[in-house]
Amino acid sequence: MSDYKSTLNLPETGFPMRGDLAKREPGMLARWTDDDLYGIIRAAKKGKKTFILHDGPPYANGSIHIGHSVNKILKDIIVKSKGLSGYDSPYVPGWDCHGLPIELKVEQEYGKPGEKFTAAEFRAKCREYAATQVDGQRKDFIRLGVLGDWSHPYLTMDFKTEANIIRALGKIIGNGHLHKGAKPVHWCVDCRSALAEAEVEYYDKTSPSIDVAFQAVDQDALKAKFAVSNVNGPISLVIWTTTPWTLPANRAISIAPDFDYALVQIDGQAVILAKDLVESVMQRIGVTDYTILGTVKGAELELLRFTHPFMGFDVPAILGDHVTLDAGTGAVHTAPGHGPDDYVIGQKYGLETANPVGPDGTYLPGTYPTLDGVNVFKANDIVVALLQEKGALLHVEKMQHSYPCCWRHKTPIIFRATPQWFVSMDQKGLRAQSLKEIKGVQWIPDWGQARIESMVANRPDWCISRQRTWGVPMSLFVHKDTEELHPRTLELMEEVAKRVEVDGIQAWWDLDAKEILGDEADQYVKVPDTLDVWFDSGSTHSSVVDVRPEFAGHAADMYLEGSDQHRGWFMSSLMISTAMKGKAPYRQVLTHGFTVDGQGRKMSKSIGNTVSPQDVMNKLGADILRLWVASTDYTGEMAVSDEILKRAADSYRRIRNTARFLLANLNGFDPAKDMVKPEEMVVLDRWAVGCAKAAQEDILKAYEAYDFHEVVQRLMRFCSVEMGSFYLDIIKDRQYTAKADSVARRSCQTALYHIAEALVRWMAPILSFTADEVWGYLPGEREKYVFTGEWYEGLFGLADSEAMNDAFWDELLKVRGEVNKVIEQARADKKVGGSLEAAVTLYAEPELAAKLTALGDELRFVLLTSGATVADYNDAPADAQQSEVLKGLKVALSKAEGEKCPRCWHYTQDVGKVAEHAEICGRCVSNVAGDGEKRKFA
């Protein structure tokens, strides 16, 4: 028997079947670094229209977690897809390097500044620590396959950036947005510093819930207001609070002007409550026998005075819109030094902003004899006992409620009035302008707009000063007596910035005021405060984007971070940019959800459900992690687990196998010599290229809309359905058995070449390592890297006017599906072994029959059977299978007649008819020794 294997065009490629990504990717990274791939891309894209994705700086502390990976991979997908779309899209990664977490780490190792080290030495240690953290995180980010200017990232602790942060503050001051005030701010007693809103988290806390009676100073005036004379006992206005420790700072009681307030007689006294809350308060304080003596509007009680239960002074009733009927008594204890609403209304009524609490959270001397020096949270019980002793406590119980806590220490924080510097939201219209700017930004998902609008509309002034060691100095001089800013503040700040640009922030602390103030130095003091770390990152649109040469003066197109950044970086950047320039710093803002485990639970080391990106990369490879990120809808929570990553690996194998099939069948194909013109190609091959064209249109639209899970779904559909289960199956016969250089085979290879050229580019932004690997095996002259080019433009399709157009082949796909069902049943019934043992008769109604007949003898190749005939639908025998999909089709199957050709495996009746090749069929004889078969359709 002759060996005809050598006459077949069997697929062959060096592209491995197994990805072995964990082992192979590091070598690719080394090549990318050695070649300076990022630099090559920049050179290739020079002069193109720009797209700038400005990197929100992660904090330089600790190893990267799965959330970091999601963020950096999404950014990389966008930057690479923009490059392929014809943009110059430089990516400059950055790090946030100042602030409390780094101070705490350095304190743990070396002690607080001033203990073992000077403040200057402490700052140097902080700088060293931040630099080591940057290096560690950078290695992991690079390992993810993220391309960027890793050799020249921006660090908020770079001297030039520190100087530019000072300049940004100067611009804001010049535009009139800064003011100083003793104002209640979030204060962490462990940090001993003010906290930004973004540094506050909420946890459940148990607090005493108390109802307290403030006795009226002028009882008769109150009786007159309520038009009553017979009142048994004193009259009191009752407040409810869960922060008894703030009562020493009480300076008023707020009531609502339009609420009805009732005078209620209870045993031995009368109390004033919001009428709608009387019943619930009576239940709470355990009173069943009570009488409502009269009601008045809250406005009637304004400025009536009530005695503080233990502080020895009286306070007014004032009117406030912040009073609600949700809980309590309808009368709100008001301490302007301990709450933003209290402060605002206190300003309106000229109340004292009293703050009896020191930075360590203990009462200052002279507050009250039994409270001086006591921690405020320990003072709650003392205050409750005091109220009980004075007969002012109507009720006390423990209550669990959501309470603000420090993001770093996880401990409860307080509102505390301290002298601080603020960016005003309203004195120069910053709030109104910011709200206007928000409307001009594209928010992705679109609910982000309403979220940030609500935050901007309701946020207080931004406290930007901090009492810390490791941070950018505010660089201000204030008059010793008046505390007014120096009249030449902007000029002086620029002088400081120039010094910081050379020597870093230490230049400010080393600066002798005489050096720049001369004779005025003894009249002014240096402000010791540093800037809120959110000011550092929030000003990078100015300190980084505006000055980096690769951005060429262009503003950022996109900011992309987790959804917590609406109140964080998106907010601080918007505030600073609008205050400086009157406009938003971004054109688009994209947010992604948080990572959760496979059951939707928050990731937690204590639960043990965290997924380490380093482990995933070491086990499965970065491309699997990248594919998981891309295939997950980032607009909601992003679930990740070993099982979910395993599914991503399965999807990866499908894509890799498709790429390998294409490469293996392009063996021996030189596009410069072997390409077949579209008009000379087999129709099915043109259809396949058209499928790629349609897929590319969908994929590019999805990339443009940042719908990466749609990209992956469309890519998978193309690989699995249009290619895997149809086209690639059909062409194997022609590809393997036709003459090597025949039009029939070269047509097929031409289609595969076009498809591979497109596919490798679709993959590149997501499966960057695999795309680079595929690129190296593609035939033909090309640039060294897929990332320097653009989307493939060589695709074409069938015209709608052609008889065998896309609609024709769509119907053929359905016919093929119906035939497969019949074959599968026959195999199950042991009638045939494989599809080539079968011959089918398609009983079709005239319109479908005409289409099937048009393929002639090539119909069998489409159906993967050894025989295929078309007959009239009405002639179908009883055992023909009615199609459920195509009403005008019935399928009958029989065993194929003739012998099996050992070369093509088809059963035919002309096997052995040619003496010289007695074992093979006539078609194979033609392909081996003759002119080769001609294919027109399939």
Curated annotation (Swiss-Prot):
Binds 1 zinc ion per subunit. GO terms for molecular function: aminoacyl-tRNA deacylase activity; ATP binding; isoleucine-tRNA ligase activity; tRNA binding; zinc ion binding. A motif ('KMSKS' region) lies at residues 602-606. It is found in: Cytoplasm. Pfam families: Anticodon_1, tRNA-synt_1, zf-FPG_IleRS. The modification N6-acetyllysine is found at K183. L-isoleucyl-5'-AMP binds at E561. Its EC number is 6.1.1.5. GO terms for cellular component: cytosol. Its main location: cytoplasm. Keywords: Acetylation, Aminoacyl-tRNA synthetase, ATP-binding, Cytoplasm, Ligase, Metal-binding, Nucleotide-binding, Protein biosynthesis, Zinc. Gene3D superfamilies: 1.10.730.20, HUPs, Valyl/Leucyl/Isoleucyl-tRNA synthetase, editing domain. InterPro entries: aa-tRNA-synth_I_CS, aa-tRNA-synth_Ia, Anticodon_Ile_BEm, Ile-tRNA-ligase, Ile-tRNA-ligase_type1, Ile-tRNA_ligase, M/V/L/I-tRNA-synth_anticd-bd, Rossmann-like_a/b/a_fold. It comes from the Bacteria. It catalyses: tRNA(Ile) + L-isoleucine + ATP = L-isoleucyl-tRNA(Ile) + AMP + diphosphate. A motif ('HIGH' region) lies at residues 58-68. The keyword Membrane does not apply. Its cofactor is Zn(2+). SUPFAM superfamilies: Anticodon-binding domain of a subclass of class I aminoacyl-tRNA synthetases, Nucleotidylyl transferase, ValRS/IleRS/LeuRS editing domain. IleRS has two distinct active sites: one for aminoacylation and one for editing. The misactivated valine is translocated from the active site to the editing site, which sterically excludes the correctly activated isoleucine. The single editing site contains two valyl binding pockets, one specific for each substrate (Val-AMP or Val-tRNA(Ile)). HAMAP family: Ile_tRNA_synth_type1 (MF_02002). Monomer. Belongs to the class-I aminoacyl-tRNA synthetase family. IleS type 1 subfamily. This is Isoleucine--tRNA ligase. The lineage of its organism: Bacteria, Pseudomonadati, Pseudomonadota, Gammaproteobacteria, Enterobacterales.
